[in-house]
UniProtKB/Swiss-Prot annotation:
Pathway linked to the protein: Cofactor biosynthesis; methanofuran biosynthesis; Cofactor biosynthesis; coenzyme A biosynthesis
Organism ancestry: Archaea, Methanobacteriati, Methanobacteriota, Methanomada group, Methanococci
Needed co-factor(s): pyridoxal 5'-phosphate
Record's protein name: Probable L-tyrosine/L-aspartate decarboxylase
PTM-bearing positions, type N6-(pyridoxal phosphate)lysine: 233
Alphabetical keyword list: Decarboxylase, Lyase, Pyridoxal phosphate
InterPro entries, per database record: GrpII_AminoAcid_Decarb, MfnA, PyrdxlP-dep_de-COase, PyrdxlP-dep_Trfase, PyrdxlP-dep_Trfase_major, PyrdxlP-dep_Trfase_small, Pyridoxal-P_BS
Length: 384
């Protein structure tokens, strides 16, 4: 085929994809990347962080990005990597937990909430972890009293806890402050999955925070061992750009495997070949937007979230919980049926597992007119 014919054929396939800016994607935690990412992607498209000695500049950028992420998570000594996404980040954290537990001759018993991302189910299967599921509170967060009692019971040997800061379905945040105290007092590891919340909570204005709700989640809490944070969600980086950060580089030895034929003789990430595009794009976008830019981005998303909730209630819909961040769960006893009917009209929402509700993620690509159009379609769908 000629080059132009190839491109024309590819455009036909691409035209079948949904576009973020059209406003029909309401259930994804990803969004249209910042425009500067196009230029950066072209500059770094051939780089491979799997062999960092060949790409010294890109490798240095990764260290800078980890430092920048560490800074917004209150840790100037953070160690980690920019990887494929939240799934790989969570798998990496669980792999470290497993290897640390083995080194201490402890059982691999880990407390993980029902609201956790499905990547932890993959980790359980791959690593043969024994998972304890604590009950949830009315706010869909883990019952801290149950966890404390369970951990302190001498019969239950727990090696780690997973807390969620912005759960995939509802946006709820576990009480990481109390979980951190339990982790410190009992010498156990605590991983925080802030794949979504990591680029929301640090920039969230107090006026959007729920009263009586604890938003603390990062390395400012002494018990936090590791954090998942994804730049390709609210960070506006292109896919794939996920992040895993550990408190310090003492965790590296629990991840390293020998890689004698590479320029560096050990490798810690699950995926070997890693494009530098995610690293470079994250660096550029974070430098361009800065703290103020992300604050504006989050505040705009929260204003749209408030609008969605207000309009939904005018139509007679109720939320499963008051939104903790820019994720809304609208109660629906026939969620799967409603979801499929909406899809027939080209609206793509998702459903919650832990509650009978539709799930809408108010990402930056959504505009007020998209939200209003969706709610009108939802209302019409429920009439029939």
């Amino acid at each position: 085929m000629e080059e132009q014919d190839i491109l024309n054929e590819l455009r036909k396939y691409r035209s079948q994809d949904l576009k973020y800016e059209e406003g029909y994607i309401l259930g994804s935690m990803c969004t249209k990347p910042h425009p500067i990412a196009r230029k950066i992607s072209e500059m770094f498209f051939e780089t491979n962080l799997g062999d960092p000695g060949l790409f010294n500049g890109t490798s240095k950028l990764e260290k800078e990005v980890v430092s920048m992420l560490g800074s917004i998570l209150h840790n100037n000594n953070a160690f980690g990597y920019i990887i494929s996404g939240g799934t790989e980040a969570n798998l990496t954290a669980m792999r470290a937990f497993k290897n640390i537990s083995k080194s201490k001759d402890k059982k691999q018993n880990i407390i993980i909430p029902e609201t956790a991302h499905f990547s932890f189910d993959k980790a359980r299967d791959m690593m043969d972890l024994n998972v304890v599921r604590p009950p949830l509170t009315e706010y869909f967060t883990m019952d801290v009293k149950f966890i404390r009692d369970y951990v302190e019971d001498s019969k239950n040997e727990i090696s780690g806890i997973v807390g969620i800061a912005g759960c995939t379905e509802l946006g709820s945040i576990d009480n990481i402050y109390e979980l951190s105290k339990i982790a410190v007092e009992n010498d156990i590891l605590l991983h925080v999955d802030a794949a979504f919340g990591g680029f929301v909570i640090p920039f969230l204005d107090d006026k959007y925070k729920l009263k009586g709700y604890n938003y603390d989640f990062d390395f400012s809490l002494n018990g936090v061992s590791s954090i998942t944070i994804d730049p390709h969600k609210m960070g506006l980086a292109p896919i794939s750009a996920g992040g895993i950060l550990f408190r310090d580089n003492t965790f590296k030895k629990y991840l390293d495997v020998d890689a004698p034929y590479l320029t560096e003789k050990q490798q810690a990430t699950l995926i070997g070949t890693r494009s530098g595009v995610g690293v470079a794009s994250t660096w550029g976008i974070m430098k361009l937007l800065g703290i103020e830019g992300y604050e504006n981005l989050v505040n705009e998303s929260m204003e749209k979230t408030k609008h969605l909730v207000k309009k939904a209630r005018e139509y007679g819909f109720e939320t499963a919980i008051d939104p903790v961040m820019n994720i809304v769960a609208l109660k629906d006893e026939n969620k799967q049926d409603t979801c499929m009917k909406l899809r027939e009209e080209n609206w793509y929402v998702s459903v919650c597992r832990c509650v009978e509700a539709l799930r809408i993620v108010v990402m930056p690509h959504l505009e007020i007119e998209h939200i209003d159009g969706f709610l009108e379609s939802l209302s019409n769908t429920k009439k029939y």
